[in-house]
Amino acid sequence: MIRFIHHFNYPSEVSRADGEAWYLGTHVPLIRELPGVVRYRSWRQIDVGIPYPSAGAPTPHNQFVRRTELCFEDHAAWQTAYRSAPQLWSRAPERRLGFGEFECMFIGEEPEFDLLRDAPPQHYKYITLQLWWPGGRPEIDENEEIFIDSYCFFYAPHTSFADGEDWYLGHHTREGKQLPGMRHYRTWRMIRVPEEPGSPLKPNRWARLTELGMSPTAYIANMVNEETRIRFTRSPLGNVIGGWMNISIKLNQVDDFLHPGRAAS
């Protein structure tokens, strides 16, 4: 199974209501007719009140209206579907119904690491390092409902993939999994694929997709509030992240376009 993940907005001067009416009423029915579609689900953006810009919420933050996945048995099946109707993925002109900003990637069915359970190899050489809490570890209510901060990033041009992974998996996620209130933490390495000639889609731009799950209160205490937030270890190479994007969602608030009414799993 391969998952074609896409995040998008509607063009400027197109209202959210009009964009959703186009997406649900025009685009989705056409996608359902493509050959080889195994699963088709979408999550709407939610606003959980994370202030930005801030240390834990860089700008832009929560900038997409939806995260959607379209699943096929393999990449060849996706190619067949895409080539049958490439116009479905074109960007719309300003003030016209269709897609505005659109970012996509391919990932596998299962994460590379379920970080609350798994230890990436990069963890081990840094395992004895302690977390830096200048104000002390914050107290968190573990029973509050969580949201998912679903984010993607790529490494800076001056950073090799290996050096970027050493920092992200060796430091950032090793520290992140220890944050109080962290209850969901999974990361996928992107699957690189041959890009379609002339296509506007650039699925190989990104390095990883990560899902981080905690309550809004925990997120703010751990990563936003200057008095309580952790100070993550910085890379000696400087800023190794070249680009970043995210959307806030709840995994159980999902539109299943192939099986309307089916409960989220």
Show the residue positions of the predicted features:
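Macromolecular interaction modules
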Residues: M1-S265
